[in-house]
Amino acid sequence: MARVCKVTGKRPMTGNNVSHANNKTKRRFLPNLQYRKFWVESENRWVRLRVSNAALRTIDKVGIDVVLADLRARGEI
């Protein structure tokens, strides 16, 4: 399963671990993804989404109805 946020589209990034001796090895920076259930009052049901912590803040700010409308417009839900 892809580690992608449904709302923001955040994906893993690549970078380096850097030791004290300045040796570099490749690593991945993973997004902080959580499975969350949101109650949608207009539909009278729960919606389960895999979202990043930044997306949780967005949902708190604009509301789940606006976010779901955007997801449906993009064809992701």
Swiss-Prot record:
GO terms for molecular function: structural constituent of ribosome. The lineage of its organism: Bacteria, Pseudomonadati, Pseudomonadota, Betaproteobacteria, Neisseriales. PANTHER family: 39S RIBOSOMAL PROTEIN L28, MITOCHONDRIAL (PTHR13528), LARGE RIBOSOMAL SUBUNIT PROTEIN BL28M (PTHR13528:SF2). The keyword Protein biosynthesis does not apply. InterPro entries: Ribosomal_bL28 (IPR026569), Ribosomal_bL28/bL31-like_sf (IPR034704), Ribosomal_bL28_bact-type (IPR001383), Ribosomal_bL28_sf (IPR037147). Belongs to the bacterial ribosomal protein bL28 family. Residues 1-21 are annotated as: Disordered. GO terms for cellular component: cytosolic large ribosomal subunit. Keywords: Ribonucleoprotein, Ribosomal protein. One of its GO terms (biological process) is translation. It comes from the Bacteria. This is Large ribosomal subunit protein bL28. It comes from Chromobacterium violaceum (strain ATCC 12472 / DSM 30191 / JCM 1249 / CCUG 213 / NBRC 12614 / NCIMB 9131 / NCTC 9757 / MK).
